[in-house]
């Protein structure tokens, strides 16, 4: 569960490391927390420094500190979300993947966490591109 001002880990290679949630975009109550598969608006709190290529241009998909981005929650530390078959899954941390605001495509090209796993509910909600980038779908 992600509330406003929650700091979460970014697990793609877009350059961001930590993001702070500033708005939950979902149907229902505006004060309800974000669950796995929900879209959030976040501010990048910590990012890797931009490096220049040999040609002298920076990567276009990179984000920097202070940027406002959209993201999809892919893992949650809370265990209170029950699936249709009655099982529950809890991960060790809460993580998200940055996406394009208009198209919904991921900004990064890889999911780079220690294990690279995401929740299965993303596939049910139509985020097949994120599931294909992940090494495991649990």
Curated annotation (Swiss-Prot):
Ranges in a coiled coil: none
Subcellular location: Mitochondrion
CDD domains: Ribosomal_uL14 (cd00337)
InterPro entries, per database record: Ribosomal_uL14, Ribosomal_uL14_bac-type, Ribosomal_uL14_CS, Ribosomal_uL14_sf
GO terms under biological process: mitochondrial translation
Keywords: Mitochondrion, Ribonucleoprotein, Ribosomal protein
Domain of life: Eukaryota
GO cellular component terms given for this protein: mitochondrial inner membrane; mitochondrial large ribosomal subunit; mitochondrion
PROSITE patterns in UniProt: RIBOSOMAL_L14 (PS00049)
GO molecular function, one term: structural constituent of ribosome
Quaternary context: Component of the mitochondrial large ribosomal subunit (mt-LSU). Mature yeast 74S mitochondrial ribosomes consist of a small (37S) and a large (54S) subunit. The 37S small subunit contains a 15S ribosomal RNA (15S mt-rRNA) and 34 different proteins. The 54S large subunit contains a 21S rRNA (21S mt-rRNA) and 46 different proteins.
Similarity comment: family membership: Belongs to the universal ribosomal protein uL14 family.
Known function: Component of the mitochondrial ribosome (mitoribosome), a dedicated translation machinery responsible for the synthesis of mitochondrial genome-encoded proteins, including at least some of the essential transmembrane subunits of the mitochondrial respiratory chain. The mitoribosomes are attached to the mitochondrial inner membrane and translation products are cotranslationally integrated into the membrane.
Record's miscellaneous remark: Present with 2500 molecules/cell in log phase SD medium.
HAMAP family recorded: Ribosomal_uL14
Protein's recorded name: Large ribosomal subunit protein uL14m
